[in-house]
Amino acid sequence: MTKKAKTAMTDTSGAKQVQSVPAVSDVAPVNRTYKSTLFIMLFQDKNNLLELYNAVSGKHYTDPEILEINTLENAIYMTVKNDISFLIDGRLSLYEHQSTYNPNLPLRFLIYIAKLYSRMTRNANLYGTKVIRIPPPEFLIFYNGKEELPERAVLNLSDMYEKEDPHAGLQLSAVMLNISGENNQKLKEACRTLKDYAIYTDKVRRYAEELELADAVERAIRECMEEGVLKDFLEKHRAEAKEMSIFEYDQEKHMRQEREEAWEDGRAAGVNEGIQLAKQILQLSHQGESPAEIARKCNITLEQVKKILE
């Protein structure tokens, strides 16, 4: 029997009616051409996901069945699935993993949440006079890349508008949490799976500096299993985890190289643009913005900001 998600509707008399709409997870087709990142492989398990939600929210839930995972298939990613969405506490949570900084995530989240709400209300009367109740969303990004970013940053949709408008009718804010290295230790201590994941990915990245990538991943897996890090998961999914880790690292390296090449091309082709960018960075610095915030707003790395400010 198909599960149903409940949408409450209130009429003008105050009486509530409940309309059933199909849960997203029941109606979305599965497309196996997309690979899940290691992060998603871990946290699509309800026990791990509940552990992460408790760590983020400060809650202490113990029953993973209160989670309703409703991740969209074939949403807006190209070849790698790095997001998960779920309902709990009357809220709609969207978690995404990133190994490279992406300033366009607020817009991507907007597109994603619109598709989710569309699915959730597919049988509701959007043209009626009764209010259709929808769960409020929250957007979290778990970042574990090489770029030096703050432990916590807020990415706003309004920062993407061509024209600054304090009265813009649409806003969306996403919180980015840096889980690389020593960042957000308290959060990682509260979620063992997240801590182990961060340890594993840090090992892969470190060993890849001196070994062939496949050898670096194999060494990281072997050490983690010996140290009890993701041991059960790696015992069950060793081959798949190795394949995904190699693919992810190659993707991360490729994207980083593309950004570096674009930066160099821009410098060679547009000296004037570089001057204007430097002026913008200096102006933001004089206004009290931190180097990390300047990097985010200008869509460049923290190292590039620091070089200009020196």
Model-predicted regions and their roles:
Residues M1-E310:
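Elongated, amphipathic alpha-helical interaction scaffolds
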